[in-house]
Amino acid sequence: MSEELQQKLRDQLWEVANKLRGNMSASDFMYFTLGFIFYKYLSEKIEKHANDALVDDEVTFKELWAMEKDTDIEELQESVKTECIENIGYFIEPNFLFSSITESIKKKENILPILERSLKRIEDSTLGQDSEEDFGGLFSDIDLASPKLGKTADDKNTLVSNVLLALDDIDFGVEASQEIDILGDAYEYMISQFAAGAGKKAGEFYTPQEVSRILAEIVTLGHARLRNVYDPTCGSGSLLLRAASIGHANEIFGQEKNPTTYNLARMNMLLHGIKFSNFRIENGDTLEADAFGDTQFDAVVANPPFSAEWSAADKFNNDDRFSKAGRLAPRKTADYAFILHMLYHLNEGGTMACVAPHGVLFRGNAEGVIRRFLIEKKNYVDAIIGLPANIFYGTSIPTCILVFKKCRKEDDSILFIDASKDFEKIKTQNKLRPQHILKIVDTYRERKEIEKYSHLATLQEVAENDYNLNIPRYVDTFEEEEPIDIHAVIKEIKELEVKRTDLDKEIEGYLKELGLVE
């Protein structure tokens, strides 16, 4: 599908979202809109899959379920249901498909009860199956009784019906071979648009595509194919999907604390065509309840919440993730708790890249102890990349990317890149353009030194700076100003004073001519 048609799908979906906006917050109408889009996608996907499975039987999915029941029909129905659950993870009976709901809408029926049952039936179809964890509670955030949808039941039914009818008019391209790229791209666009309007909440579920691209490119360098990729604070899963796509990862793993965002991440995986058996997204607090034990991964990426609080409980002094660093990360700034957690899950030949506030580079006390441990004792720090300010939704603070490897050699240097001035301002947001991303990735790949942009610092140099990683200590971006000619400035001032005197006299003459002064 051409870029023009992709943009058309984006615009159509965003227009549908605006039908729901009303008095809702950006995050509220996001979950309704994306949930309905996902429901339509699942419906179209299973109808196509079932029809393909029934080609030899010369009957369609809907026709089969409309037939009068007998033993042969029931056996064929059960066979189709089993085949669907085993291959795509779920099942929807024809009368609960999106298309069946819209047919009811056109008959002016109240569709909220059957829509609610339809969403529940999708989840229930996976009970006891391998896909249960990926579908359980998936639609729990779609509350069709919510007053946000309208004051009365009729108001709610009218609004939801209008949204579903608008979606019904949009071709998702499920019949096309490139379906995943088309709808996946549109879904990502929708999430980014919601993030733009969500303010501070945006950081909870979305990493800008430009930053995701840098992280993904870095962790996949040197790997023709990743076995797996992991994000401990995965949000909507966009960063995970980008890394998995670039690295051709076989499996995707993530954890997300917010239950609503966790549902969004699972939807995002399925809608991008990731088979239920190839991803595992867990709901829970990564630091307090690690869902992945001692599992290690080829690539680890993350955009953890900046300077979040955590318990820093005494029990963590005996936790293998944190115990060797000498100190726990402070209770009010968990940045290094996330970093140590990620390193624990990184395998010996892997690469980890995460976003963090600049404070992690220079703050002292416990964080200084941990930073020194990672540099002096472990030699894990591979690169520090300074990003422009105001590139994340909801915060204008400058950020950096930290890159870690466990397989560094003793004499390896640490690469510092100052990309803080490379951006394009678009309205109130700064954006990294493709050439800026390429420059960062190329500089990292080649480990190049570029004047006023990058520097390779020896471990000795870092030690002499007391393990302070603040980028200006290593990359001199100072621009000398041209020397000022004092005598020329004085001469110019005198000439301006003469001109001012002449103008005063000229103005006074005009005022006299007008009789305004004597």
Task: Give the ranges of each region predicted by the language model.
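A generic secondary-structure signal for well-formed alpha-helical elements
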Residues: 40-53, 194, 223, 247, ...
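A conserved structural/catalytic subdomain of Rossmann-like adenosyl-cofactor enzymes
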Residues: 4, 290, 294-518
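Short small-residue beta-strand/loop micro-motif enriched in glycine and branched aliphatics
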Residues: 195-198, 250-251, 424-425
